[in-house]
Structures are given as structure tokens and as C-alpha cells.
Design a protein with these regions (language model features):
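Expand to "…catalyze enediolate/carbanion chemistry for C-C bond making/breaking, isomerization
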Residues: 1-134
Length: 134
């Protein structure tokens, strides 16, 4: 039998409402799955300046809420999916650089979806490391 990976992408506001229910259903069926969180796609919005973006605090919240939901249900988050670049782009708002809607046009280089920049990616890596230590 092969492996099954379930990639969740609820959006930061919906994780705690829906993920625990999904976990319970999967467990009741006796399925052994790998859980992966995609906090990018469920948190894409159109900025007031017209750019497709992702608020960093929403991405962060979805990751944190996913860890919380898995802990409460006795399961483990086995993976995360991020869209990122090592370049200093301004495609996602927020983070320690405090990128706002007006900053998006400065270095918006994506050919498709907005990516976390190097600073935001590192900030997120530290969050994941903190969650894994719990």
C-alpha cells in the first residue's frame, strides 16, 4: 500500500474550525496519513493597490493553528509547503520588514503567485523550529 499525504489549505481563520474535524474523520477510518500544511494558497488576497499578495501574519497564523490542531488531536504535522525565494522581493505583506500594500510595487517580480522573501522565509523557519520543540 502506498503513502497518502493530505495537504491542508484552509486559510488562517478556518484551520481550528475544520482541521480537527478532518483529523477525527481520517482517524476513524483507520488511515495512516502524512499531514502537510499549505499556508500559502488559502491566504491569498488582492491588495488595495491591486496586487495579488499574502499577508505574512495570515501565513504564520495558519502554520501555528495547524500545529495547535494536530497537538490537540494527538497527530503530527509532517510537512509544510511554502512558496519562497532567496531574493529581496516585495510580494507578501508583513514580516519584520513591515512590507505594506504601497511597498508591493517596489520589487514585485513573481510570474505567478506571491512568494515569501528571504527575510520572511527565515522568520517562518524560526517559527516552525519553535513549534517542533514543543
Amino acid at each position: 500500500m502506498g503513502r497518502l499525504t493530505l495537504i491542508t489549505r484552509f486559510g488562517h481563520n478556518n484551520v481550528l474550525d475544520y482541521l480537527p474535524k478532518l483529523i477525527k474523520i481520517v482517524q476513524s477510518e483507520g488511515l495512516n496519513v502524512v499531514w502537510c500544511c499549505d499556508p500559502m494558497h488559502g491566504n491569498t488576497v488582492k491588495s488595495t493597490s491591486g496586487f495579488k499578495t499574502r499577508p505574512f501574519d495570515h501565513v504564520l497564523a495558519e502554520v501555528q493553528n495547524s500545529f495547535t490542531a494536530h497537538r490537540s488531536e494527538g497527530t503530527y504535522l509532517g510537512g509544510v509547503h511554502f512558496e519562497m525565494t532567496g531574493k529581496d522581493v516585495t510580494e507578501c505583506t508583513g514580516g519584520l520588514q513591515l512590507i505594506d500594500d504601497e511597498d508591493l510595487s517596489l520589487r514585485y517580480h513573481t510570474a505567478c503567485d506571491p512568494r515569501l522573501n528571504a527575510s520572511q522565509s527565515l522568520e517562518l523557519a524560526f517559527l516552525v523550529a519553535e513549534q517542533l520543540e514543543k
